[in-house]
């Protein structure tokens, strides 16, 4: 996150709510185009009157998950979406589902956008449009404490569980040995349960989600996290839209506004407790 904050603060030096021009930056894997200039004061409220269908996860704490006590979907992504809604003026309705369904419904234009801790991978960028990164993360491997596994190379021939349709699943398919048995799950809760029981030997998951689980189960978990950081460049999160989405620039401007005025940092401090 330090890299993206540094970038946004650099942009913030030429940004003001009174109408300063913002040179726009696209994802680095897209073809380079001439810098696009947008006036910030012409973006606020430009989506007023629109009601968007938003795909989210109900199982990706602390970003987007179902809170059984509040009986609703909540998390960092949901609060960020709410602030984007306030700035741009749109209303929204949440549709919780797994990643594979999110991608399919975005393609079919049954959803307007998805915000669910979605990694901006090269493969996804060929099919979808993304905002600039709003959260930097990476992948790690989790094993049982009694497994004696201390290194990535030691999971060869082991059973590895991953959530289908995620960057974790893609990493497993691309980099694990042919001797590994990969088991695909609909949600991360089932992965954690099976890993705790020993049904699988390891999992690969986003570090923030791992830290959230370890914190919530500090007194009763039998799991251990390997130190190695994996796949950092393709693990960062962005908001996903159908390819060529008309209002992509508005969302990018709004994200910068929320960073520059301190809103983003407040949400991060509220929801995400990570080791720096």
Which residues fall in each region the model found?
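Bilobed "Venus flytrap"/periplasmic-binding protein-like clamshell domains
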Residues: 58-61, 73-86, 118, 140-192, ...
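Extended ligand-binding regions for polar small-molecule ligands
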Residues: 21, 78-87, 146-149, 153, ...
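C-terminal motif of bacterial Sec signal peptides marking the signal peptidase cleavage site
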Residues: 16-19
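Ligand-binding clefts/hinges and TM-proximal coupling segments of bilobed small-molecule sensing domains
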Residues: 22-44, 48, 167-186, 221-227, ...
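Periplasmic-binding protein-like
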Residues: 58, 136-143, 207, 215-256, ...
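Acidic, polar ligand-binding/catalytic clefts
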Residues: 78, 86, 91-154, 224, ...
């Amino acid at each position: 996150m330090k890299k993206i904050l540094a970038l946004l603060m650099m942009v913030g030096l030429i940004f003001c709510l009174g109408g300063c021009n913002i040179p726009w930056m696209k994802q680095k894997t897209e073809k380079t185009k001439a810098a696009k200039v947008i006036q910030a004061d012409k973006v606020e409220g430009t989506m007023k009157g629109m009601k968007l269908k938003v795909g989210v996860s109900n199982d990706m704490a602390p970003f987007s998950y179902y809170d059984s006590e509040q009986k609703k979907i909540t998390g960092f992504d949901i609060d960020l979406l709410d602030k984007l809604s306030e700035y741009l003026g749109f209303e929204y309705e949440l549709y919780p589902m797994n990643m594979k369904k999110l991608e399919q419904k975005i393609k079919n234009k049954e959803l307007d956008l998805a915000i669910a801790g979605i990694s901006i991978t090269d493969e996804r960028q060929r099919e979808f449009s993304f905002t600039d990164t709003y959260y930097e993360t990476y992948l790690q491997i989790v094993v049982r404490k009694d497994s004696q596994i201390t290194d990535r190379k030691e999971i060869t021939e082991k059973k590895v569980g991953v959530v289908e349709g995620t960057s974790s699943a893609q990493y497993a398919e691309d980099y694990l040995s042919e001797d590994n048995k990969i088991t695909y799950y609909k949600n991360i809760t089932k992965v954690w349960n099976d890993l705790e029981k020993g049904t699988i030997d390891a999992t690969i998951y986003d570090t923030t989600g791992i830290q959230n689980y370890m914190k919530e189960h500090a007194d009763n978990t039998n799991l251990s996290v390997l130190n190695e950081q994996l796949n950092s460049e393709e693990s960062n999160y962005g908001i996903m839209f159908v390819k060529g989405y008309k209002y992509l620039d508005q969302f990018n401007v709004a994200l910068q506004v929320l960073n520059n005025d301190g809103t983003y940092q407040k949400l991060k401090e509220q929801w995400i407790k990570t080791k720096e």
